[in-house]
Amino acid sequence: MIIMYAIGIGDNKEEVLKAYEKLKEEGIEVELIDNPKLLVDKLLDGEIDGAVRGSLSSSKVILYLRERIGKFYRASILKNPFTNGIFLLSPVGIDDISEDKNERIKDKIRIIEFASNFLKNYNIKAKVAVLSGGRLGDLGRNKVVDETIYEAEEIVEHFKGNVDIIHNGILIEEYLKDGYNIIIAVDGITGNLIFRCLGLICKIPGYGAVILSDKNVNFIDTSRNANWERYYNAIKFLIGGDFG
């Protein structure tokens, strides 16, 4: 039997094994791999069609993947609790975008372009919401917040007239209620925290984080603290591109 997909198994073995058994019940054979480099190499060398990080260490898998394919970004696919559609949240990797302001803006612009193309592949029109650190009326209260507001406005201006894009401060709940499907976090730390609050604490369903890159890499990043459903959903998405 040819095995076309693999899941990394490190910490949190029990949840990975639950996903593995559930997939097996459905006739889907998945290889479990405990070596980060082997997981990446098998994917990029064409031995498997898709890979899920599973519960392997991010610092090992992601750094090695970056060595192999160069720069990329990650976008978590989550269910919108208000619309039942999906949305992409990015950046979610703590080192996905630059600490330098100008480079950070360029990174976010690239993320929006990649994420818009990703949704287009599923016949979903991109609606982009850029987060900043406070309400627009908070301008002048905190220098760090002010910078995030100015940065968000600069990004919106870049796409003006070409992309359905909005900046209305920190109000992520309003963006989601209005059906925005690409949420751009202030930085990777903020994005990671949002994902953990929504996905791991509030249990909003998700499919892992896709790779946003100029290369076609069939890899899904997942948290090592996820429950079995996230690993299961990631494999199902790789197989059929179905958001369930």
Swiss-Prot record:
It comes from the Archaea. Disulfide bonds: none annotated. GO terms for molecular function: methyltransferase activity. Keywords: Methyltransferase, Transferase. It is an enzyme of class 2 (transferase). InterPro entries: MeTrfase_MtxX_xsu. The keyword Zinc-finger does not apply. GO terms for biological process: methylation. Its EC number is 2.1.1.-. Belongs to the MtxX family. This is Uncharacterized methyltransferase MJ1371. The lineage of its organism: Archaea, Methanobacteriati, Methanobacteriota, Methanomada group, Methanococci.
